Amino acid sequence: MIFTNAILVISALLPATVLSLQHTEDSLFPARCWPDPCAGITFQNDTYVCGDPRLGPVVLPQKFPLNNELRTYARFGALCPAEFLDKWATDVAPNGTYIYPPANGFALDTEEQPILGNATLPVGMKLDRFGSEYGTFLAPLGAPYIERSLPPSNLNTFDGMYPYNYHVYQVTKEFVVGLGPIAPWFEQPGMGTQFVTYTNVLGLIDDGYLRRLDESEYDEKVEYSNPYTPGPNQ
């Protein structure tokens, strides 16, 4: 309710701005979740949807390439926020944590075995991830967020140098990863490609296998992992 009331207060002061904010709020939740889409959620911080860090930031990126990667994102699928947490976290209460998929998030075959194999990433390949450099998951540059099966909290900013916790890298020495399709999870369809490394990303940087890229080094359409991702000027 506090989240909704904040929008209404701003509307009295900034009518033009609030139209955009109200549209943003409306589009966050399925219509059936109204009039109180945040029911059952403990408010903690107005940076986050319903005030809960697990539900991710209220404002999503507007700048290429992140706006394209999130263009098809429906944060909660057909669920209301409390239903989403009830399904995907250990508890709706703030102390609940997300439940992650088995088998490192790889899709499973008909015998419930993960579909993956080893692959060598070539020098020059560009990769990205939403998450800290202590993690071991990477994706082809520009993969849509819905294909990654990540929770909304992976979009939270912890370091101002990396808004939305987004990091881009280039392979500088060949290395081997586990490669395979991503299982559906967190109300997302998944089925993108993930690379699981055998040491964390920070270790790969320190050992010279990866280097961090600046924005100017990944701003061309041709660099992206799929042919349907528009470039920054489209």
Swiss-Prot record:
The keyword Ribosomal protein does not apply. Induction: Expression is up-regulated during conidiation of A.fumigatus strains displaying high adherence to pulmonary epithelial cells. GO terms for cellular component: extracellular region. Residues 120-212 form the TNT domain. N-glycosylated. Residues 1-20 form the signal peptide. It is an enzyme of class 3 (hydrolase). The keyword NAD applies. Ca(2+) binds at S216, D219, E220, E223. Keywords: Calcium, Disulfide bond, Glycoprotein, Hydrolase, Metal-binding, NAD, Secreted, Signal, Virulence. Glycans are attached at N45, N95, N118. One of its GO terms (molecular function) is metal ion binding. It comes from the Eukaryota. Pfam families: TNT. Changing F137A: Abolishes the NADase activity. Changing Q194 to A/K: Abolishes the NADase activity. Residues 21-117 are annotated as: Thump. It is found in: Secreted. The catalytic activity is positively regulated by calcium via its binding to the calcium-binding site. The C-terminus also contains a calcium binding site (residues 215-224) that might be involved in NADase activity regulation. The calcium-binding site is not alweays present since it emerged in the order Eurotiales, which includes Aspergillus species. Homodimer. This is Conidial surface nicotinamide adenine dinucleotide glycohydrolase nadA. The gene is nadA.
